[in-house]
Amino acid sequence: EGYNDWSIRFKKLKEYAKKEGAPKSFLDDIDQIETPIYAGKISKPDVLLEEGNIKNVNRNIEIIFTPGHDRTEISILDNPSQILFSGDHILPKITPFIPLEDAEDDMLEKYTSSLDKVYNLEQKLIAPGHGALIEKPYSRIEQMQLHHKKRSDKIIDLIGNSKFSGWEIVNLLFPRKLDELNLRLAFQETMAHLIYLENKGLIKHVLNSDTNYWEKVRQV
């Protein structure tokens, strides 16, 4: 319900950012966002695909549910050729953006679990949604797993023995000046990592009436 209603996404993002100490300029920028031209209305699907082999086709094709970059993301494995069509899940040069869908929805956990799932598939080549073919699929997946581990470790180190609002952590993690779009992406990506680390029991989210903040969990 409302999956492709971008106004709902923007409203949730603004509410969340305000509680994380985002400045008025950032909140005002969210109000100015227009629905992307590529985000047309989604028609009701004729067929709902389930994870597993596609039936009634003359080829061994398998649907792999790979949420993370998007909550409905799928990859498609052509078993005869062992080519994985990864969409935006695995890209050759960059790591896909992990969105802040909902404070209760751990999108980074979903993404890293999806990487683990795909790593265990028999594959010779990855055909991504953007960029060149990935000829060393397992190496690329390992690189992406390491990227998120390093970022998580860096956030833990940045917090140290202090406590910071989500917005302060964004500025620590991304110190150089970003344009409006990349600042929104950086905010959501940072929040996705914070939620992930909280669910791992490594940090905690302290909720205040004014601005929420994050701190490390004291190990006994």
Language-model-derived ranges and their functions:
Residues E1-I54:
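Active-site HxH/HxHxD metal-binding segment of metal-dependent hydrolases
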Residues R9-F10, I141, S152, G166:
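A general structural signal for well-ordered alpha-helical segments in protein cores
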Residues D29-V47, N60-S152:
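Metallo-beta-lactamase
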Residues E50, P67, E215-V217:
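Residue-level detector of conserved, well-ordered beta-strand and adjacent loop positions
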Residues I54, Q123-K124, F164:
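Generic structural signal for secondary-structure transition and capping sites
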Residues N56, S75-L77, E215:
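Short, well-ordered beta-strand micro-motif
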Residues K154-V220:
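C-terminal regulatory/interaction regions
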